[in-house]
């Protein structure tokens, strides 16, 4: 894999660990739908895994009451366990599978319990310290691409075998 150049203030996703790291960050994470703030925290858990942009898990208590509805379907992560999907419902608008969580995470990832990650491409705005995050390509992965991360990123064309 040919790595993208890393500029000042950037980090390469190719320096992230596998299995992933999961650490609380003081960054301000804001998620908006239909002009409403549905999540706002400075206590998100930032998960970093080789070849993926970071994913931010928001503690459930920092998500607006009543906006999450459990969705059908599930998937599994070899590291974190079985994922539960969530729809976001705001002002009569339903965004299917807008986020996911690990309700019974695997050992080593217990601190993700009760936190929800949002797909930045499915909500109206996903902000990291005020910067709009771009979605990770491909639709399955939920990484948040900001100016501080360099790729290339899994999910882009030709990355299926990574």
Which residue stretches match the model-derived regions?
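Terminal leader/tail segments of proteins
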Residues: 1-162
């Amino acid at each position: 894999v040919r790595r993208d150049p890393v500029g000042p203030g950037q980090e390469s996703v190719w320096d992230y660990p596998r299995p992933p790291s999961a650490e609380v960050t003081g960054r301000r994470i804001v998620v908006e739908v239909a002009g409403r703030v549905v999540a706002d925290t400075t206590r998100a858990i930032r998960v970093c895994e080789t070849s993926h942009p970071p994913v931010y898990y928001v503690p459930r208590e920092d998500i607006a009451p009543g906006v999450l509805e459990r969705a059908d379907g599930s998937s599994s992560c070899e590291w974190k366990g079985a994922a539960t999907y969530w729809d976001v419902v705001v002002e009569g608008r339903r965004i299917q599978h807008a986020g996911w969580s690990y309700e019974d995470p695997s050992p080593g990832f217990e601190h993700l319990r009760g936190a929800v990650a949002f797909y930045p491409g499915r909500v109206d705005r996903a902000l990291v310290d005020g910067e709009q995050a771009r979605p990770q390509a491909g639709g399955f992965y939920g990484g948040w691409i900001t100016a501080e991360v360099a790729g290339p990123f899994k999910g882009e064309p030709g990355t299926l075998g990574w």
